[in-house]
Swiss-Prot record:
PROSITE patterns: TPR, TPR_REGION. Keywords: Acetylation, Endoplasmic reticulum, Membrane, Repeat, TPR repeat, Ubl conjugation. The lineage of its organism: Eukaryota, Metazoa, Chordata, Craniata, Vertebrata. This is ER membrane protein complex subunit 2. TPR repeats lie at residues 87-120, 155-188, 192-225. Ubiquitinated when soluble in the cytoplasm, leading to its degradation by the proteasome. Interaction with EMC2 prevents its ubiquitination and degradation. The modification N-acetylalanine is found at A2.
Length: 297
């Protein structure tokens, strides 16, 4: 097989820069990273200077994703030789154990890292990833809660915890996690949308009102969020048909649901879909409007 430099007529400097770009973008295109990186390592290691070490790490992670343990081990051995005792290299060793499904060995290694450095967030997160891979959701939740006691500002961890609670159908705790995220990211429409979905799932008039409010907020932040638009329709429709809702509340929510249904209708008309797709999409919206008319009568 021809080399990357020959196939694409690129220089090793361009390949190095491409690897850097993928790192900066957190790209997980493992096959490409492995192909370009392996050629850099094999043919241009002496020219890369200190960049070689981060490329070894990058290629190793890609090789683990792709099932190339031979390449992953080679990169790991080079890193061990250069950085003996490094916690970062030990974490990479743990990730190789994970890829081999040697979870107990990986956990023991991460625990040793944490004994030496309790603030090592990467090792803690790897332990949580293992619990999830093993299907031990309760343990993953416990570990995440312990982690967040020390690193309360980690938004990624709060979102991961919310997802785990949703999987366990513990919607009250999931809502709490999403509230934490919305406090620090009030302009993130996806957090508003997900919070609205959780409240919708919890049900009951009060939760449905909150659901409608946050679906509306998600739409305000991103008027192209179709999921929030459908959510607004559904939550308003359920409030309008709720026997505990006052007459004014029913009237207002019929208006909100009607507006949402019309917006959905317009969105499909502007989407440039095929006539057949548009026909079925519009029929679904017409059914929504019909339901509203039944509720209103």
């Amino acid at each position: 097989m021809a080399k990357v430099t020959e196939r694409y007529d690129v220089t090793w400097e361009e390949m190095r820069d491409k690897m850097r770009k993928w790192r900066e973008e957190n790209s997980r295109n493992s096959e490409q990273i492995m192909e370009v990186g392996e050629e850099l390592i094999n043919d241009y290691a002496s020219k890369l200077g200190d960049d070689i070490w981060i490329i070894y790490e990058q290629v190793m992670i890609a090789a683990l994703d792709y099932g190339r343990d031979d390449l992953a081990l080679f990169c790991l051995q080079e890193l061990r030789r250069q950085f003996p005792g490094s916690h970062r290299v030990k974490r990479l060793t743990g990730m190789r154990f994970e890829a081999m499904e040697r979870y107990d060995d990986a956990i023991q290694l991460y625990d040793r890292i944490l004994q030496e450095d309790p603030t090592n967030t990467a090792a803690r997160k790897r332990k949580i990833a293992i619990r999830k891979a093993q299907g031990k959701t309760v343990e993953a939740i416990r570990e995440l809660n312990e982690y967040l006691e020390q690193f309360v500002g980690d938004q990624e961890a709060w979102h991961e915890l919310a997802e785990l609670y949703i999987n366990e159908h513990d919607y009250a705790k999931a809502a709490f996690c999403l509230e934490e995220l919305m406090m620090t990211n009030p302009h993130n429409h996806l957090y508003c949308q997900q919070y609205a979905e959780v409240k919708y799932t919890q049900g009951g008039l009060e939760n449905l009102e909150l659901s409608r409010k946050y679906f509306a907020q998600a739409l305000k932040l991103n008027n192209r969020n179709m999921r929030a638009l459908f959510g607004l329709y559904m939550s308003a429709s359920h409030i309008a048909s709720n026997p505990k809702a006052s007459a004014k509340m029913k009237k207002d929510n019929i208006k909100y649901a009607s507006w949402a249904a019309n917006q959905i209708n317009r969105a499909y008309q502007f989407a440039g879909r095929s006539k057949k797709e548009t026909k079925y999409s519009l029929k679904a919206v017409e059914d929504m409007l019909e339901t509203l008319q039944i509720t209103q009568s």
